[in-house]
Regions:
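N-terminal, active-site-proximal structural segment of metallo-dependent hydrolase catalytic domains
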Residues: 1-50, 61, 66-67
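Structured beta-strand-rich core segments of catalytic domains in phosphoester-bond hydrolases
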Residues: 38-40, 44-117
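Metal-dependent phosphoesterases centered on the DNase I-like endonuclease/exonuclease/phosphatase
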Residues: 52-55, 130-228
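Surface-exposed cleft-lining segments at the edges of enzyme active sites
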Residues: 85-86, 114-131, 166-172
Length: 230
């Protein structure tokens, strides 16, 4: 059985100081997709390039201490793709793809970090531009090969994907346009789609146990007032 994990690190230095390497060793994934590495190549050398006997491949942001994604793998990929060809967003370190190809099958594993629009209108518009680029990229990839997309999507698709959906309908992460993008991705249409939300396929009614992000405000984590953004 192939074991795949996805995790937002919120900084690799912080995560390792809190025991993520021991957790990786204990859970023994074949691949672990990570987001928000918040480091540069020089920071990783001789320390974070390899964790728990898994070798890492990364896409770093040009801006220091910002964004960055990676995939730690137990298996050598046949190819590594850094970025998805975006003039705007490849500078932000948001996409790494490992290809595991055999004569019988072409398979990609992707770690992606979607932009957040919560800081203001400028970043929300950037998020919309990212979504407009990323859907056709995934559809082109789907026409060529199988893939598994992991990451911090920064979108709660359905009402059951966040605690307080009524009060968040005008907030980034649950905007109608963002949710419509997810629907287009997951449902087969003339524009493509047909991607499977694996978590929802396995847990179609899960609510309180589904959350992956909690606000730092108030007692959101203590009260499990969360969102499924990953």
């Amino acid at each position: 059985m192939f074991k795949l994990t996805s995790l937002n690190l919120n900084g690799i230095r912080s995560a390792t100081s809190k025991g993520v390497e021991s957790w990786m060793a204990a859970t023994r994934p074949d691949c672990i997709c990570v987001q928000e590495v918040k480091a540069q190549a020089a920071d990783m050398a001789n320390r974070f390039e390899r964790l728990a006997d898994l070798h890492g491949h990364f896409h770093f942001a040009q801006k220091k201490g910002y964004s960055g994604v990676g995939i730690y793998t137990r298996h050598e990929p046949s190819d590594v793709v850094i970025g998805y060809g975006s003039a705007e967003f490849d500078a932000e370190g948001r996409y790494v793809e490992l290809r595991f190809d055999t004569p019988e099958r072409k398979l990609s594993i992707i770690s992606a970090y979607f932009p957040s629009g919560s800081s203001g209108e400028e970043r929300q518009q950037a998020k919309f531009r990212f979504l407009a680029e990323f859907h056709p990229h995934l559809m082109r990839l789907k026409a060529e090969r199988d893939f598994i997309l992991c990451g911090d999507i920064n979108i709660a698709h359905q009402q059951i994907d966040l605690k307080n959906w009524r009060s968040n309908q005008k907030n980034s992460g649950f905007l109608p346009e963002e949710r419509a993008w997810m629907t287009k991705l997951l449902h087969t249409t003339d524009e493509g789609g047909g991607i499977i939300d694996v978590y929802r396929q396995l847990q179609p009614t899960a609510t309180d146990t589904a959350y992956t992000w909690w606000s730092n405000r108030g007692q959101a984590y203590a009260n499990n007032v969360g969102w499924r953004l990953d």
